[in-house]
Amino acid sequence: AVRPQSPGREASSGGISMRVWIDADACPRAAKDQVVKFALKRQFEVVLVAGQSQIKPSFACVKLIVVPSGPDAADDYLVEHAVPGELVICSDVPLADRLVKKGVTALDPRGKEFSPANMSERLAVRNLFTDLREQGQMGGGPPPHGEKDKQAFANALDRILTRLMRQA
């Protein structure tokens, strides 16, 4: 695993044209695999940021950064290093809120893009579910990542990458 440092952004003359970051600890493997498949086809860099060591796909376009453990260490790293024009894949709503406020595009592994227009609603729903879980009125976690989610994610990823590459 690579120690924390900012990956270099190369000029678009044959180098990396864009970067997709993944909050790797919570991202389903199917979503990570889909991003890597797109990266191989469209020639962009994928940076997995994790709080614990993981198996990194063995492609040159993929980097793994393991941050020191601690609450929100991976989130803080993503907010510090991702820049507008890049995409972050995350299911963490407070993290997405921080990224969107910075102008970074964020997408959840089920294919729903976070935006300034939907952030307050998504934060409210997240807080409600957290409260219900803490009161024992609801089980923990989202449902399993199914085929419908995989397709919605692939479609949203394609749409967002196309948009970001046009803006680059």
Give the ranges of each region predicted by the language model.
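N-terminal amphipathic/basic-hydrophobic helices that include classical n-h-c signal peptides
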Residues: 1-17
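Nuclease catalytic cores that cleave nucleic-acid phosphodiester bonds
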Residues: 18-168
